[in-house]
Amino acid sequence: MWGIAPFQENSTRADKYKALGRPLKQAIPSYVETWKPGERVKPLVVPEDLRTESFYLGDFGQAMKLGVPMTTQQGRPPLRWCSPDRLHNEPPSFACDMWSYMCLFAELYLDFEPFHGWANGGVITTIVEVLGPLPEKWKGSYVGDESRDEWYDPNTTLWHDSLSGLIESRRPDSDPVERQHVLSVLQRGFSYCPEERLTATQLLQDTSFRALIDKYCG
């Protein structure tokens, strides 16, 4: 994250709005009927002239020194970027990092967080709605306060195809080939099984990911 130069002490709210813009609200798409349409505030974009030369790593306090056993690591990243295996008492791994990266990649492409905590049951509910039921072997090991049987029930009818639907609804400007590239990357990056999740090396060599990078990053 870029460092931000401080405002002058006598700066008014109007001065700050002029420099940063007013907070913009975005509608939260929902595949189910809700009592009230949801909204979220769009993340702040800091102008270049307010950035400092300092740069900060947002590691959520999870950075580890080389040689430190993974099993000694405490804590987890924020829930909406945390892999579901970590939320079921599985140890941290590089596969967990890849899940978090995929959340950021999806948010950049979709301009929307794929998994959030606004639904009943929290972030796991939205993960299940988008990706389908969790592995049954995880049942009983959820670290949160509330666990739901339908999260692990393979017969539960949920929005199994909503990952593709989310891509199509959030990026109607994209063509079918591009949407298929994005779906291919996200399906493998969001695999429930850490061993089957894309590694960083595999992602960089993936033809679908490279096609997207070539288009948007030159």
What feature does the model see in each segment?
Residues 188, 194-218:
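Regulatory extensions flanking the kinase catalytic core
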Residues 1-77:
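Activation segment/activation loop of eukaryotic-type protein kinase catalytic domains
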Residues 62, 67, 86-92:
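Conserved region at the C-terminal end of the protein kinase activation segment
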Residues 61-68, 131-185:
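C-terminal lobe substrate-recognition/regulatory segment of protein kinase catalytic domains
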Residues 109-110:
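Structural recognition of an alpha-helix C-terminal capping motif at a helix-to-coil junction
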Residues 97:
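Conserved catalytic-loop aspartate of Hanks-type protein kinases
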